[in-house]
A protein has these predicted regions:
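A generic secondary-structure signal for well-formed alpha-helical elements
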Residues: 28-32, 78-82, 86-87, 101-109, ...
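Glycine-rich, acidic and aromatic/proline-enriched surface loops and short helix-turn segments
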Residues: 22-30, 42-48, 103, 124-126, ...
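Intrinsically disordered, low-complexity segments enriched in small/polar residues
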Residues: 29-31, 130, 148, 174
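Extracytoplasmic/secreted proteins, especially bacterial periplasmic and envelope-associated proteins
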Residues: 12-19, 23, 69-73, 77, ...
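Acidic/His/Gly-enriched intrinsically disordered linker/tail segments
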Residues: 89-155, 162-164
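Short linear capping/connector segments at secondary-structure termini
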Residues: 38-43, 121, 173-176
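Juxtacatalytic substrate-recognition/specificity segment
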Residues: 1-90, 139-143
Length: 176
């Protein structure tokens, strides 16, 4: 059953969470809450992977071979309602920062972040011909939502980081 994790997978997830917590504290400042609760699972009625975050807590479906989702949801502890003015109208800010931060953490952990960035670029090229003028118009599917809100935003942040340098950009983010 893909919704059940082995004890070894849970140990690996705990190690990754500890690494991510230390990395994000070093990059963005102290963990902003008193405790952190991480749970794993799937949406009970569908068995589909569940990813959900709130202040001091996140739930994920563990992925084999990558800790991206774990790092992304953990990054939301710094970038959930702390960056955007509204998680409804400005959710792209929270998602872009969490995606960008997850890739930085993957890189620091020795995981393959380059392939993730390449996939972002390919996705962005795939929808480049489409026109999105208005924020309040529905997108044409979940993939487009992911590309626009998660990936394009993260690519924008990466461009800023590359333009000013990682240290300078991290200083800016910490100050923001």
């Amino acid at each position: 059953d893909s919704t059940v994790n082995t004890p070894e997978e849970m140990d690996t997830a705990m190690e990754a969470a500890e690494f991510g917590l230390e990395y994000f504290e070093g990059a963005f400042g102290p963990y902003p809450y008193d405790e952190l609760i991480m749970s794993t699972g799937a949406v009970p009625s569908t068995g589909m992977p569940a990813s959900l975050e709130s202040s001091g807590m996140f739930t994920i479906q563990l992925e084999r071979g990558t800790n991206y989702t774990l790092y992304h949801e953990l990054a939301h502890q710094w970038f959930y309602c702390l960056v955007g003015n509204s998680e409804v109208t400005d959710c792209w800010l929270d998602e872009a920062f969490a995606t960008w931060a997850a890739y930085l953490c993957m890189e620091a952990a020795g995981e393959d972040a380059d392939t993730r960035w390449e996939l972002c670029e390919m996705d962005a090229e795939n929808i480049a011909g489409r026109e999105y003028r208005y924020v309040n118009v529905p997108l044409d599917g979940a993939d487009t939502f992911k590309i626009v809100f998660y990936e394009r935003g993260a690519m924008f942040l990466r461009e800023l980081e590359e333009a000013v340098g990682r240290d300078e950009f991290l200083n800016f983010v910490r100050g923001y």
